[in-house]
Regions:
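Extracellular/periplasmic carbohydrate-active domains that bind, remodel
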Residues: 2-433
Length: 433
């Protein structure tokens, strides 16, 4: 669809029909815009993309704090669109109604198939309102399932709600459902909130990640419910200062850091805290995964107060994540790897759907170091004992650990595996990060 750029005069005329709240003597002027004022139909059939573009341009060009409302009781069909900043002042996007995607993948032809609702270079944006963003991804999933190259077809599906190069963004109190692929993505963003969300898609919908964080910093993902076909939360690239709390995850693939180091890249995932989570009926619980041949670190990670129920692989570190990694190693061939260490597992309890409850499959080139298991109790569903597997994994145990830990002691690292624990960055004096 060709989106037309309206003239400033027309924008001014359209803005004239909205409600302008300018209270005499008020400390802050506010402007209220609604999508319908810009010609939106909201019947779920008409293409309302141009109305959204015009409304966004009006809001973005306003000098005052602006509220842009997607009214309740209506469904607005929006085709692939980019809403760009920078804007002149704060924008509050209130999604009270429904925003739905076109059902057919054909509507992405000639454009960027990787995006649906794309925000670029925006600061001070709050998205809330209690409404629904529905990707209607069924036809995309069918393409992936029926294609001879299903993985490639799934990878080509668009990200539903995508923020790139944005700052001070909050997405709160929405339902995101049936995404074509990832539901909510933050790429190279800082100071981000994604709270009080309900994110759902069928268990077998390919690649339907809940929240994907890519090279973003100072991120809070809290008080959310995920029931998806992929990872509930996935953290990749160079992410730091990430906080996950009060999350329900399942079904899906659990919570994942990585894969890091894909195609010989340098990635650092650091200062990541996750606690107070319930993970049920998932393929994995909490997972750290890295590619061979990559560089960088996964360090200062805490998993705490997590209850697992019928999880196939509750705790896993996999430093040989994919044999399909084709990039040139960023270090010495056959001797480079992302360094994994300073990973704490505290108060992890529940049941494993498989015999192996803990897997630490670390790299020969760069073994895992400074792992810590504190009060871990994972038993097998239906009774029976679970087990743990370790390869080149070093660390310590505190309190009772079930199944019995297989971690090697750290002093063995210094004597036998000097490359282990070669984590980059200062590790002293920051125990309370």
């Amino acid at each position: 669809m060709a989106l037309r750029a309206r003239t400033p005069l027309l924008l001014a005329a359209l803005a004239g029909v909205v409600v302008a709240l300018r209270l005499s003597g008020a400390a802050e002027a506010r402007v209220l815009l609604t999508l319908d004022d810009f010609g939106a139909v909201g019947d779920g059939i008409a293409n309302d993309t141009q109305a959204l573009v015009d409304a966004w341009n009006a809001a973005c060009g306003t000098d005052d704090n602006t509220y842009l409302n997607v009214p309740a009781g209506k469904s607005y069909q929006i085709w692939p669109v980019t809403l760009a900043g920078p804007c002149r002042d704060e924008i509050k996007l209130l999604i009270s109604g429904n925003i739905i995607a076109p059902e057919s993948p054909d509507e992405w032809r000639g454009g960027d198939q990787g995006r649906w609702l794309h925000f670029s270079g925006v600061s001070d944006l709050a998205v809330s309102g209690g409404g629904i963003i529905d990707g209607r991804g069924q036809q995309w999933w069918a393409l992936a399932e029926n294609s001879t190259s299903g993985q490639e077809a799934a990878a080509a599906a668009p990200k539903a709600l995508h923020f790139a190069d944005c700052q001070d963004v909050a997405v709160n109190g929405l339902t995101l459902q049936n995404s074509q692929r990832e539901h909510l993505v933050f790429t190279r963003c800082s100071s981000v909130e994604a709270n009080y969300l309900r994110v759902t898609s069928p268990e077998h919908s390919p690649g339907t990640v809940g929240v994907l964080l890519v090279s973003s910093t100072n991120v809070h993902v809290m008080d959310d419910l995920f029931s998806v076909g992929g990872d509930c939360v996935s953290i990749v690239g160079n992410c730091t200062d990430v906080r996950l709390r009060a999350i329900s995850c399942g079904p899906g693939h659990g919570i994942s850091i990585g894969g890091l180091g894909e195609n010989g890249s340098l990635h650092k995932a650091e200062k990541i805290k996750m606690d107070t989570m319930f993970i049920s009926n998932t393929k994995y619980g909490v997972r750290v995964k890295t590619y061979e041949g990559g560089c960088g670190t996964a360090r200062k990670v805490k998993f705490a107060q997590i209850v697992m129920k019928n999880v196939s692989n509750p705790i896993i570190i996999d430093q040989n994540y994919s044999a399909s990694n084709r990039g040139t190693p960023c270090g010495t061939p056959n001797a480079s790897a992302v360094a994994v260490g300073e990973i704490d597992y505290i108060d992890i309890t529940g049941t494993s759907a498989t015999e192996r409850a803990m897997t630490f499959a670390c790299s020969d080139a760069m073994p895992c170091s400074r792992l810590s298991l504190t009060r871990v109790n994972l038993t097998r569903v239906g009774g029976g004992s679970a087990s743990a597997y370790c390869h080149r994994a070093f660390g310590k145990n505190v309190g009772d650990v079930v199944p019995a830990s297989c971690l090697c002691k750290e002093d063995f690292v210094r004597r036998q595996a000097p490359t282990a624990g070669a984590l980059q960055g200062d590790t002293e004096g920051d125990a309370d990060w």
